[in-house]
Structures are given as structure tokens and as C-alpha cells.
């Protein structure tokens, strides 16, 4: 579960390497987010020459969490790291490549472009 002040690895080539969560979107008292949730974050580490710069405020969708997510069949999906993909206002990714696997739960949240760019969908 991702909450305020959580640091996430960025799983795309938008130029950001690490982001810090400012807010989990979806309600005024929402405390935590899981796979497929949108967060507002600031860029803490960035590569030179990238699309996004350090200290930019961006929106991102969570694609991997250590705590995992429960599926309808009762199974759980967990990853080794917490990661997100930076998105535009229309929920399309800012980068052109996605690194690492993403969860199947992203299909339900209108993130098909991220699912199609990902090398592996678990």
C-alpha cells in the first residue's frame, strides 16, 4: 500500500528515476493506494535531458507494490519494489517505454496503453 511520503521507482523513460507521493487521488480522506490507483507526486531524482525535471509535480499510476493486491480468485500478486508510471491528464504515459512487469489490474482502470507497452503483464 502506498501512502503520502512514499517513494516510488519510476518504471518508464520519461526522465524521472524516483518520485515522492504527495496525495493519493480518489476521495478527500483517502490514506492509501494500491495497484492501478493514481497519485500526485514530485520528482526527487531525474536523469539529465529527460521530459520531466527534478521538483516537477506529476501524476502517476501505481504499477507494482511490495504489499501486493488480492485478486478475485483469491490469489495475491506481489512485487519486489514499489513502482509507478508517469501519466498525462488523459491517462496516457509520458514516456515511450515501460520497464519491468506490470499487474493485470491496470486493464480495469483505462490504462491499456501502459499494458500494451509493458514487456510482461502478470
Curated annotation (Swiss-Prot):
The question of whether rRNA-binding is a record keyword is answered with yes
Q: Name one Pfam family in it.
A: Ribosomal_L14
Q: What PROSITE patterns does the annotation carry?
A: RIBOSOMAL_L14
Task: State the UniProt keywords alphabetically.
Answer: Ribonucleoprotein, Ribosomal protein, RNA-binding, rRNA-binding
- The domain of life for this entry's organism is Bacteria
Which purpose does this protein serve, as stated in its record?
Binds to 23S rRNA. Forms part of two intersubunit bridges in the 70S ribosome.
**Which family is it part of?**
Belongs to the universal ribosomal protein uL14 family.
- Assembly description: Part of the 50S ribosomal subunit. Forms a cluster with proteins L3 and L19. In the 70S ribosome, L14 and L19 interact and together make contacts with the 16S rRNA in bridges B5 and B8.
Put simply, this protein is called Large ribosomal subunit protein uL14
Q: Which organism is it from?
A: Lacticaseibacillus paracasei (strain ATCC 334 / BCRC 17002 / CCUG 31169 / CIP 107868 / KCTC 3260 / NRRL B-441) (Lactobacillus paracasei)
Amino acid at each position: 500500500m502506498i501512502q503520502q511520503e512514499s517513494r516510488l521507482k519510476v518504471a518508464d523513460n520519461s526522465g524521472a528515476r524516483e518520485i515522492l507521493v504527495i496525495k493519493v487521488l480518489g476521495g478527500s480522506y483517502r490514506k492509501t493506494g494500491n495497484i492501478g490507483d493514481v497519485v500526485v507526486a514530485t520528482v526527487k531524482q531525474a536523469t539529465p535531458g529527460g521530459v520531466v525535471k527534478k521538483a516537477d509535480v506529476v501524476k502517476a499510476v501505481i504499477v507494482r507494490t511490495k504489499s501486493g493486491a488480492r485478486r478475485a480468485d483469491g490469489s495475491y500478486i506481489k512485487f519486489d519494489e514499489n513502482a509507478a508510471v508517469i501519466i498525462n491528464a488523459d491517462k496516457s504515459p509520458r514516456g515511450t517505454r515501460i520497464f519491468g512487469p506490470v499487474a493485470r489490474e491496470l486493464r480495469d482502470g483505462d490504462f491499456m496503453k501502459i499494458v500494451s507497452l509493458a514487456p510482461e503483464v502478470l
